[in-house]
A protein has these predicted regions:
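Short beta-strand-to-turn element immediately C-terminal to the catalytic PLP-Schiff-base lysine
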Residues: 8-10, 226, 250-256
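Short secondary-structure boundary/capping segments
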Residues: 31-33, 97, 225-226, 241
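Short aromatic-enriched loop/helix-cap "lid" or pocket-rim segments at secondary-structure transitions
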Residues: 52-56, 217-218, 246-248
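Conserved beta-strand scaffold positions in the cores of enzyme catalytic domains, especially
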Residues: 39-41, 149-151, 233-235
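Conserved core of the PLP fold type I
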Residues: 64-66, 71-202, 206, 212-214, ...
Length: 276
């Protein structure tokens, strides 16, 4: 009579305990960079440790763990935690005069990750214009994702519109509210020129609004996205400066048409989802 069910066989040890390893294993030594003590550190990505509210941060984390302990183990929302995206939308509306939906916001672990998503969304056949001088890491990340970048010169109003029009770029990445490294603020006239350029075909502006929270006096400069009537601006920002680089929270706001395209193309993705 044939028996049904599950049967377990004993697994014998395939390797003798006394067996010597005869294969030569190469030893790899990792050369760690030496720690240098600088006289003056001009690194622009540092925070003041004595200014960070560690006690408050720790108290909030403990309370959230107690209040929402089960939710920390659940599958996160697509495009980032919903509460975070809602808070970002509120912040943009109140602080930057930019009215967007939380559903337009994508949260990622750093701007580099979001740059890669933009490349996949707009295509590797895109040509991205960047500012010269500018933050060279931006073009390095784009190029590492297989996209050609061109570095366009600056004039007294920002990136040269004449050079942009002569180029074959279909995307321009700019920091109009606080250019790196000069600190220039792009005037309204140049912003409207760039928007007119973007309106001519399948072109987009990536507005990198880093450092927008910091100013000595007055109100913050309005974003280009807030005056964009044709959904041509992809707005980006990060909390690396306002909180800490280790937080690794960046976000971008996609125009509705691109958000629809993104949702269809990347429905399998779950971006930054750690609730803490």
């Amino acid at each position: 009579m044939r028996k049904n069910g599950y049967f377990a066989n004993e697994i014998t040890n395939q390797i003798s305990e006394n067996q010597e390893v005869t294969e030569n294993v190469s030893e790899y030594k990792i050369n760690k960079p030496e720690k240098v003590k600088w006289i003056v550190d001009f690194n622009s990505n540092h925070v003041r440790y004595d200014s960070f509210p560690f006690a408050t941060w720790s108290k909030i984390m403990r309370q959230k763990l107690l209040d929402e302990e089960n939710s920390f183990l659940m599958t996160p929302s697509r495009n980032g935690i919903w509460e975070l995206r809602s808070a970002i939308a509120k912040h943009l509306r109140e602080f930057r005069g930019l009215t967007v939906l939380a559903d337009q916001i994508i949260v990622g672990a750093g701007t580099e990750y979001l740059y890669g998503l933009i490349v996949q969304l707009l295509g590797r056949d895109s040509v991205i214009a960047t500012e010269n001088p500018g933050y060279r890491k931006i073009s390095m990340v784009y190029e590492s994702n297989g996209v050609r970048t061109i570095h366009l010169p600056m004039d007294n109003q920002g990136i040269s519109i004449d050079e942009l029009e002569k180029s074959d770029a279909n995307i321009v990445h700019i920091s109009p509210n606080h250019h790196f490294p000069t600190g220039k603020v792009m005037p309204a006239a140049r912003r409207h020129q760039l928007l007119e350029w973007a309106n001519m075909g399948e072109r987009y502006i990536i507005e990198d609004d880093y450092d927008s929270e910091f100013r000595f006096s007055g109100k913050p400069i309005p974003t280009m996205a807030s005056i964009d009537k044709n959904q041509k601006v992809i707005y980006m920002n990060t909390f690396s400066k306002t909180l800490a680089p280790s937080i690794r929270i960046a976000y971008m706001v996609l125009p509705f048409e691109l958000m629809d395209k993104y949702t269809k193309k990347f429905r399998f993705l779950f971006e930054y989802g750690f609730k803490l």
